[in-house]
Amino acid sequence: MLVNALQEKLGYIFNRYDLLLQALTHRSSSNQHNERLEFLGDAILNYVIANLLYHRFPHISEGGMSRMRANLVRENTLATLAREFNLGDYLQLGQGELKSGGYQRESILANTIEALIGGIFLDSNIQTIEILIINWYKIRIDHMDPYASYDTQKDPKTRLQEYMQRRRLPLPVYWINQIIGEAHNQIFTINCQVSELTQPIIGCGSSRRRAEQNAAAKVLEALEHNQNI
């Protein structure tokens, strides 16, 4: 089944397929849509991130933790996470949303991530979804500077995309250059091309997501030689 690939990317196999289907269903497609799951998932996500930040950064003030949490749970971050799972390929949308490109809309992608969190919680328990969320956010947490400004706390891919958008330039293009190793022990090499650089920049990582983030970080470093971003 097509959704099996999604479950592998999420790192969780649903016991109740109906919860997975509901989490992926937009209100434009069915009355059995995902908005109640989204409500639940939003609360769970905020709890998990708040708890994680509290224990990970014991010397950071309440205001600092609030800024970090806001960055991690905001719509753009969730939509970026959804794209890393190729979530748009699995959405159940009505014809109107399909024609208008709803599978790419950040609000729909972000809401679906929250609905999946709610669905996984109902399908399992708080401990399971907490472990999953921490795993999904590991790269972002590891690269987060608690003393940095709100803008610089964004992950490299998000910062690069916003850099290009501010200048009305084409968005970065990522493609796989090479995959080495057996399944579950692979090294991905990703090329990232932007219009302001003549050659693509290469990033490596143990997953496509990590390799893309590393490539984006290197592109940002290259662009910083020309202007302050």
Swiss-Prot record:
SUPFAM superfamilies assigned: dsRNA-binding domain-like, RNase III domain-like
Alphabetized InterPro entries for the sequence: dsRBD_dom (IPR014720), RNase_III (IPR011907), RNase_III_dom (IPR000999), RNase_III_sf (IPR036389)
Keyword check for Nucleotide-binding: no
Active site (catalytic residues): 42, 114
GO BP term (any one): mRNA processing
Signal peptide: none
Top EC group: hydrolase
Keywords attached to this entry: Cytoplasm, Endonuclease, Hydrolase, Magnesium, Metal-binding, mRNA processing, Nuclease, RNA-binding, rRNA processing, rRNA-binding, tRNA processing
Pfam families in alphabetical order: dsrm, Ribonucleas_3_3
Catalytic activity: Endonucleolytic cleavage to 5'-phosphomonoester
Location in the cell: Cytoplasm
Family: Belongs to the ribonuclease III family.
UniProt xrefs under PANTHER family: RIBONUCLEASE 3, RIBONUCLEASE III
Subunit structure, interactors included: Homodimer.
Protein name: Ribonuclease 3
Taxonomic lineage of the native organism: Bacteria, Pseudomonadati, Pseudomonadota, Gammaproteobacteria, Enterobacterales
